């Protein structure tokens, strides 16, 4: 079902409302490829060595070994008051959740692991202040999802990491 929704909904977006119900409109695809056999077999082969976990991300530290690498791609913080969408699940990923993620990054750092995090470049200094002891890099990224088509395109986002 996930593959069908991913291939047929607007820009492959997955999102639910506060009741936990899927709420993405249909995409405008004439002949979407729902299932490509070669890709499925290749993915299956790669996933043979992968353990997929369900639960709170903070529990992943229990599976880290040696110098593990963590990549975090949370719901991005809104760029301004009018771009307030950041809820892909029924639980909001607000500033408190962003700070909780930063605390977990500190835990990852303290355990001797590496991390990289991507997020929006809000221009209000929120992430610059929150992650001041880490490396913060601004990079150009293309965005294709926005309610206002004129606001789609390139903008800067942040890459935050604990290594050079």
Question: Can you annotate each of these PLM segments?
Answer:
Residues 3, 115, 160:
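A residue-level signal for conserved active-site and pocket-lining positions in enzyme catalytic cores
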Residues 85-92:
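Short glycine-enriched, charge-decorated loop/helix-capping segments at active-site entrances
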Residues 1-71, 75-85, 100, 111:
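SAM-dependent nucleic-acid methyltransferase catalytic core
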Residues 34, 51, 92-99, 151-154:
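Conserved phosphate-coordination/catalytic loops
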Residues 45, 129-132, 153:
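A generic structural signal for short, non-catalytic loop/turn and secondary-structure boundary residues
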Residues 134-164:
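Class I S-adenosyl-L-methionine
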Residues 97-142:
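Conserved Class I SAM-dependent methyltransferase catalytic core
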Residues 81-82, 126-127, 148:
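Short glycine-/acidic-enriched loop or helix-start segments at secondary-structure transitions
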């Amino acid at each position: 079902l996930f593959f069908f929704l991913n291939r047929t909904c607007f820009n492959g977006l997955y999102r639910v409302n506060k009741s936990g119900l899927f709420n993405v409109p249909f995409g405008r695809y004439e002949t979407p490829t729902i299932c490509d056999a070669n890709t499925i077999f290749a993915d299956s082969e790669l996933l043979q060595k992968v353990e997929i976990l369900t639960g709170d991300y903070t529990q992943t530290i229990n599976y880290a070994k040696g110098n593990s690498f963590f990549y975090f791609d949370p719901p991005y913080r809104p760029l301004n008051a009018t771009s307030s969408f950041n809820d892909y699940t029924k639980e909001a990923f607000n500033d408190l959740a962003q700070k909780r993620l930063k605390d977990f990054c500190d835990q990852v750092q303290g355990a001797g692991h590496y991390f990289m995090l991507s997020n929006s470049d809000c221009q209000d200094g929120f992430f610059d202040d929150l992650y001041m002891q880490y490396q913060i890099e601004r990079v150009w990224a293309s965005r294709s999802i926005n309610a206002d088509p004129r606001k789609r395109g390139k903008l800067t986002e942040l890459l935050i990491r604990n290594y050079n």
